Each structure stands twice: as C-alpha cells, then as structure tokens.
Amino acid sequence: MIVNEEAVKKILEEVKPAKLVAATKYVDVKEIEKLEKLEKLGVTCFGENRVQAFLEKYENYHGNGEFQFIGTLQPNKVKYIIDKVTLIHAVDRYSLLKEIEKQAAKRDLEMPVLIQVNIAKEESKHGFEVEEIDEVFNSLKDYPHVKVRGLMMMAPHIESSETEKYFKMTQELLQRLQKDYPMYQLDQLSMGMSNDYHEALNHGSTMIRIGSALFK
C-alpha cells in the first residue's frame, strides 16, 4: 500500500476549510516515511486509534505534523498520550473525562477534547446518547483541565441519503449547545470518513477523518 498522491491532493482541496485528519492505522511504524510523504503533500494532522501503535510512531516520526487521538480510549491509557496529542476526539464516558482531568491536572495543562455522541443510538457504537448530553455539559465545571471544543460522531453504515439525516442532527445539536453553553468554545465537529465525508461537509463538519482513501 502506497500513498495515493492524486487522491490526497483532491481530498485536501475538497474538504477545505475543514481539516483533514489522516487516519494512519494502516501505516506501520516501519513505514513511517508514509507520514512524511503525506506531510509533503499538505497533510498536517494525523489521527491514531491505538495507543501502542501511536507511541511507536510518535517516537519515530520527525516531521512537523500534529497527532490527534481518534479511537476509543481506555482510561488507563490516558497518561501515555495526554502530553503528546493535540486533541482527543472520542470522549464517550464519565470515567474517561475523570481520568483526562486527573492526568491533565498533574501536568498543569488543558486538554482539548470532543464529546462523542451516539446520534443513531447504535448498540455497537460508543458515545453518549443525545438525552445525556446536557448532563455531560452541566458536569464540565468539575473538569477544569478538560477543554471541550465540540462533538464527534460516527455515522451508521447505511445508504448515504439516510446517513445525511444523522449528520444534520449532530450539526443541529452542536448549534443548540453553542447557544445553551456560551461559556465553552464549541467550534469543532468531527464527522465524516472516507465513504461519507461529502455529506458530512454539507452539514458543518470541521474535521474529516480519512484513512483508506489516501492510499492505494
């Protein structure tokens, strides 16, 4: 598998002004030059979803790009990544919020995060349900070192016409939260992947997580 230069350039142009988060789970640490190749093409942000693989790449990558954590994160792994990533996308339970607060406070830093919402109420997906979101936001005062910047969602694997409904629901939820919680800078919406990013962009996504489409 090699970097698909034409696809990378095309996608970078298509997602503007949203940020392309290159999901690099397909890139082995022995192929770290692929990250450097992506960076030369204009990719500045890499998304990892496995802590051990991320740490290996982090130690071996010598470029100027940033890393974000886009996968499900176990609370006991927070301490290994909190000072190495610029954003944690998938805060999906209170135990994770508490651990991020604990580890960020230890290091005297603010950790930007997104709250993962299970907008379609899928049993197979992580995230808070819509009905729980206000409770989450009302609890944020207990986590002064956690800086919530917006929402993250994963669309169900269904027809694109149906998927669009869930992107719209997430966009509208963020807009309501912006009005109801003006004390927080809620300006990020992480949704859309290789197979559905066009629909996500139509509904205000600011971060597109793409992996397989960048390679061939």
Tell where the protein language model's regions lie, with residue ranges.
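A short, acidic, flexible beta-alpha connecting loop/helix-capping segment that sits on the rim
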Residues: 194-198, 213-216
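Active-site-proximal glycine-rich helix-loop-beta segment
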Residues: 204, 211
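Conserved alpha/beta-domain cores
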Residues: 1-176, 180-195, 201-203
